């Protein structure tokens, strides 16, 4: 079976969804700029060899509708001969795009793919046009479609306190801020034109949503956002609302080597799994276990882990049940996570994978895991191995 490898991986800065730097920039533009960047950064690649562009996006309507993958690839100048498809596995969409490309490569259905994802949550809100079938109430609780309440449920089941959540959120902002000022995020960010608060055109090079001023004291003053009476989950311990895109160049290993391209990581294994929709945030646990089993590995074999921070109340139970409580500061989300950077739904899977690969290079790590929960009860996971 052929081997799928990551040749390059980049992301946009994360813009604040409410009146942020990308308020006048469309989702197709964020996507196209990254597609163009991958071709610029890898001049050995003949764009005519691109088999398919596979792009994750959740709210596929308005500017994100009518197959945004194709719209963006045409904007980027990718040859018309390349295909393009938009995929939707909710929060796991761009990681699913990676899995689709990897499976195609492994089975000989192409050797060069651009994958990624986007979500402009400022232009197309997360709940825009959502209309659940009434019959779902016979199968799952109505609250299962309310992500904050599922986090409350999962946190309560695992005894996660408000104080633990606040501490986890502070850590996310502190580490993301440190990664910014120390230049570590600069390795993965591709600058995008946006507008400052006065409307002036600027080149955005850093994430807008990180709040370095966040403290335990400031978070303690926030009210519960989803269950006002008995809740513990606040806006401060939830992933920020942000706009962004991420992208990867995925190739068959021998093809990449023949072109003299640097191979940054191999895809060692992949998995998706389902769980109860009422605790959708638990999905990374079964997905991770399945991916590790397929790779013949254990949790202890992993050097670094990126666990998407949908909510602190969701992340901490996953850490607990994967047996990672004692290695959080050595292995997990070393540059912060979605609580600080935001979770543009269709973007995040490739975003956390990009951050992971850069951290693996920085730490000279061999094995890494990227995993995330998915609304309505799923998880997705990818094990990467540095060559």
Swiss-Prot record:
GO molecular function terms noted in the UniProt entry: acetyl-CoA C-acyltransferase activity
Keyword annotations of the record: Acyltransferase, Cytoplasm, Fatty acid metabolism, Lipid degradation, Lipid metabolism, Transferase
Top-level enzyme category: transferase
Pfam family, one: Thiolase_N
InterPro entries in alphabetical order: FadA, Thiolase, Thiolase-like, Thiolase-like_sf_Thiolase, Thiolase_acyl_enz_int_AS, Thiolase_AS, Thiolase_C, Thiolase_CS
Gene Ontology cellular component list: cytoplasm
Compartment list: Cytoplasm
Pathway per the UniProt entry: Lipid metabolism; fatty acid beta-oxidation
Cysteine disulfide partners in this protein: none
EC number: 2.3.1.16
Keyword check for S-adenosyl-L-methionine: no
Keyword Zinc: no
Gene3D superfamilies: 3.40.47.10
Active site: 91, 343, 373
GO biological process: fatty acid beta-oxidation; phenylacetate catabolic process
SUPFAM superfamilies found in the cross-reference section: Thiolase-like
Catalytic activity: an acyl-CoA + acetyl-CoA = a 3-oxoacyl-CoA + CoA
Domain of life of the source: Bacteria
Subunit structure: Heterotetramer of two alpha chains (FadB) and two beta chains (FadA).
Function of the protein: Catalyzes the final step of fatty acid oxidation in which acetyl-CoA is released and the CoA ester of a fatty acid two carbons shorter is formed.
PANTHER family named in the record: 3-KETOACYL-COA THIOLASE FADA, 3-KETOACYL-COA THIOLASE, PEROXISOMAL
Listed HAMAP family: FadA (MF_01620)
Family the entry assigns: Belongs to the thiolase-like superfamily. Thiolase family.
Record's protein name: 3-ketoacyl-CoA thiolase
Organism of origin: Shewanella frigidimarina (strain NCIMB 400)
Organism placement in taxonomy: Bacteria, Pseudomonadati, Pseudomonadota, Gammaproteobacteria, Alteromonadales
């Amino acid at each position: 079976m052929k081997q799928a490898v990551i040749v390059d991986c980049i992301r946009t800065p994360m813009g604040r969804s409410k009146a942020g730097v990308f308020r006048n920039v469309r989702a197709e533009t964020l996507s196209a700029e990254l597609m163009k960047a991958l071709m610029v950064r890898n001049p050995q690649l003949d764009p005519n060899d691109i088999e398919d562009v596979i792009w994750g996006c959740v709210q596929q309507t308005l500017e994100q509708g009518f197959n945004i993958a194709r719209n963006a690839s045409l904007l980027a100048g990718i040859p018309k001969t390349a295909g393009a498809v938009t995929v939707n596995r909710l929060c796991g969409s761009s990681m699913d795009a990676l899995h689709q490309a990897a499976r195609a490569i492994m089975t000989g259905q192409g050797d060069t793919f651009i994958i990624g994802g986007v979500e402009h949550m400022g232009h197309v809100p997360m709940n825009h046009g959502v209309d659940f079938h009434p019959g779902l109430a016979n199968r799952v609780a109505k609250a299962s479609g309310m992500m904050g309440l599922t986090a409350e449920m999962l946190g309560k089941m695992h005894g996660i306190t408000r104080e633990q959540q606040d501490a986890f959120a502070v850590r996310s902002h502190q580490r993301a801020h440190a990664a910014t000022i120390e230049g570590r995020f600069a390795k993965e960010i591709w600058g995008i034109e946006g507008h400052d608060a006065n409307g002036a055109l600027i080149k955005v090079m850093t994430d807008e949503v990180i709040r370095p001023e966040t403290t335990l004291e400031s978070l303690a003053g926030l009210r519960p956002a989803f269950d006002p009476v008995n809740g513990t989950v606040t806006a401060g311990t939830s992933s920020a609302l942000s706009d962004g895109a991420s992208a990867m160049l995925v190739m068959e290993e021998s093809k990449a080597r023949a072109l003299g391209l640097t191979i940054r990581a191999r895809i060692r294994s992949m998995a998706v799994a389902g769980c109860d929709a009422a605790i959708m945030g638990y999905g990374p646990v079964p997905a991770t276990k399945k991916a590790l089993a397929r790779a013949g590995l254990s949790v202890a074999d992993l050097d670094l882990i990126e666990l998407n921070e949908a909510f602190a109340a969701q992340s901490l139970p996953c850490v607990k049940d994967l047996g990672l409580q004692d290695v959080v500061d050595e292995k997990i989300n070393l540059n912060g996570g979605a609580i600080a950077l935001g979770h543009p739904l269709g973007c995040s899977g490739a975003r956390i994978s990009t951050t992971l690969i850069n951290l693996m290079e920085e730490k000279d790590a061999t094995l890494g895991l990227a995993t995330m929960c998915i609304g309505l009860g799923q998880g997705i996971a990818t094990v990467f191995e540095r060559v």
